[in-house]
Amino acid sequence: MTALFGPRDAIDRAAALREAGASGVFTFEGPHDVFTPLTLASTVGDLDLMTNVAIAFPRNPIHLAHQAIDHQILSGGRFTLGLGTQIRTQIEKRFGADFDRPVARMSEFVAALRAIFAAWETGERLNFNGQYYRHTLMTPTFTPRDNPYGPPPIYVGA
């Protein structure tokens, strides 16, 4: 895996990295959106794609689940969702989000993602009720289709 940075050169950089023998590319939550360069890199071919890391707490699990599934589909099943907490100052002052009990919050965030993915895969009712997140509605209109790859692996940075 090799770092992929901004969106402007993501396609050319991903193609050059593939030509040089890289098996995949990753992005981090920095000066650009963590997903956009991966969306562009997915057009290059058989590269593995990974967020390293997407910051979880400013996002909602349902929103992130949609982004992850779309990248899993775009990459042909070669996407890995890397998540992290960031640090208190960044979460509270930059993103305006809560940072209390980060280990418990991250654990629940991942559990919510898995519950959402399972509802999409099985068609069973979504019923996730946690301390930080609650997801109890998933109608067919909002359920991704045409995903033969299943949910992506989830890695959590500490």
Where are the regions that the model predicts?
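Internal, glycine-rich beta/alpha segment that forms the wall or movable "lid"
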Residues: 67-68, 73-158
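Glycine-rich "substrate-gating" loop/helix at the edge of Rossmann-like oxidoreductase active sites
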Residues: 54-60, 98-99
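N-terminal beta1-alpha1-beta2 module of alpha/beta enzyme domains
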Residues: 1-51, 147, 151-152
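Active-site beta-loop-alpha junctions enriched in small/polar residues
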Residues: 3-4, 30, 54-56, 84-88
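A short, GP-enriched loop/loop-strand-helix hinge that lies immediately N-terminal to
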Residues: 48-54, 80-81
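Residues at secondary-structure transition points
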Residues: 32, 59-62
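N-terminal, well-ordered alpha-helical segments
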Residues: 15, 36-39, 62-69, 73
